[in-house]
Amino acid sequence: MMSRCLYCYQELGEGETDFHPQCGKKIFGSKTVPLLPYTKADIKQLAEQVIRSQTTLTGVQAKLSLDISSSPNQPQRFTIVGLWGRYILKPQTEQFKYMPEVEDLTMHLAELAKVNVVPHSLIRFADGELAYITKRIDRTAKGEKLPMEDMCQLSERLTEYKYKGSYEKIAKIIMQYSSVPKLDVINFWEQV
């Protein structure tokens, strides 16, 4: 059975595991992919700690914020960092099987349809289970927050109501705040 790259889905060469070096560089900034040293059991326990510390990321799906850490003479590895990581990790869920694979495939299909998407990939836990990882576009290479507005902020809605809006409302907000409103609203309608 042939192995495929978790980033681009193309066949891997001899000696390559999970990623082509150039694909690792695209998503992780290094040809050597950082280790994801956790297992499913670790993630469940760590996620509970993150929830207790109230440093969770908003949204419907369970997710964790990661960053890459390195020590002298040690390979780079992902660590869970609360809100300020440069990556978001979405593990498998009991409720919806294969959710990471579905999300990654959906993003690949969107790219093929010429929709701009964030850098994303599948990645393996230490126990071999797949998770979805995406690079945050609201962080600098050093992890500093970049100012970005989202539709909740522009509409002055709390994030817990972000899934209780309409496309029409979003289009009106785009028309109100965009510097090129007609172009942006056309792009919005093409994406939805």
Task: Give the location of each predicted region.
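Short, hydrophobic/aliphatic alpha-helical segments
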Residues: 40-48, 186-191
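Short secondary-structure junctions and interdomain/linker hinges
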Residues: 12, 158-161, 177, 181
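Conserved ATP-binding subdomain of kinase catalytic cores across diverse folds
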Residues: 42-162
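General structural signal for secondary-structure boundaries
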Residues: 20-21, 39-40, 147, 162-170, ...
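A short, terminal or domain-edge coil/loop segment
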Residues: 31-36, 41, 65-67, 170-185
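Regulatory N- and C-terminal appendages and interdomain linkers associated
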Residues: 1-44, 176
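Conserved kinase catalytic-core segment
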Residues: 95-111, 165-192
